Amino acid sequence: DLVIGIEVPSVEKTNELMKQCDRVLATGGAAMVEAAYSSGTPALGVGVGNAVITVDETADLDDAADKILMSKTLDLAASCSSDNAVIRVDAIHDEMLAKLQQRGGLVLDADQKAKLQQAIWVDGAINAKVVAQTPAFIADYAGFDIPEGTRFFIVPETGTGPDHPF
């Protein structure tokens, strides 16, 4: 099953479910994320407004790209459930990237990425001035130009942890 619902949820049932599945995507508070990491199952822990999407070789790539576009552009991605990060497995990496670009995704270069990072995170917190804004506004605010028709940014990341906020 892709999604399993628990009719009467409890901490015990949630912990047991996390031990039995193939992968956990844990959202919510720090305790839930820590429980996922401790379950023995590969886990992604995310905070508020940081939904992670995984696309692998079994996915309908056009459908996945359409849904990512919708999530990134509906209400300017202001919802906490908007896709924030996309993990693409190696087998479909290039093809999926091309499909996202065909839908208006712009792959940022290292200079644009650095400027965007400075614009988004100020003193370790999200800068409210760039929340729920258009790509054109954000790029202008950050100090770089983008082609007309850019609908969302694709920011290649090279690592994880506090030094890699994307």
Where are these regions (language model features)?
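Structural alpha-helical scaffold elements that stabilize or flank donor/cofactor-binding regions
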Residues: E16-L17
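PLP-dependent aminotransferase-like
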Residues: D1-E7
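Residues that line or immediately flank small-molecule/substrate-binding pockets and catalytic motifs
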Residues: E7, G28, D90
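ALDH superfamily catalytic-core signature
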Residues: V33-P162
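Conserved glycine-rich beta-strand-loop-beta hairpin in the small C-terminal domain of fold type I
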Residues: F166
